[in-house]
């Protein structure tokens, strides 16, 4: 069962790889040196075959995924999740970022002064 779960998780990446390979194969078959290029209508037919085959392969997976994740698209659930996430993580992001930047600057300056020879970095007060 674990193998099936992993294979379902890898399905989108696999579909993308198949699409890329199909496009590369279609492009390479047209790019052989020394062979005349097929007429434009044949190129269009090849590409339409690739598109229709990919649609045929991917449409059931996309439909199943959409049906499984339909609850996520319910606006009230999604809105509640986003509001909670904002309240928990993003509300005070500005002040936290400013504090972190100031602390980082101070730490970096302290490290720089500690590495600097005393003759070059002494205060001239």
Curated annotation (Swiss-Prot):
GO BP annotation list: lipid transport; positive regulation of triglyceride storage; triglyceride homeostasis
Instruction: Give the UniProt entry's GO cellular component terms.
Output: high-density lipoprotein particle; very-low-density lipoprotein particle
Which region is the signal sequence? Answer: 1-27
Subcellular location per UniProt equals: Secreted
Q: Which Pfam families match?
A: APOC4
What are the cysteine partners in each disulfide bond? Answer: none
Alphabetically sorted, this entry's keywords are: Lipid transport, Secreted, Signal, Transport
The principal location of this protein is secreted
Give the family, as the similarity comment puts it.
Belongs to the apolipoprotein C4 family.
The record's function comment reads: May participate in lipoprotein metabolism.
What is the protein's given name? Apolipoprotein C-IV
Organism placement in taxonomy: Eukaryota, Metazoa, Chordata, Craniata, Vertebrata
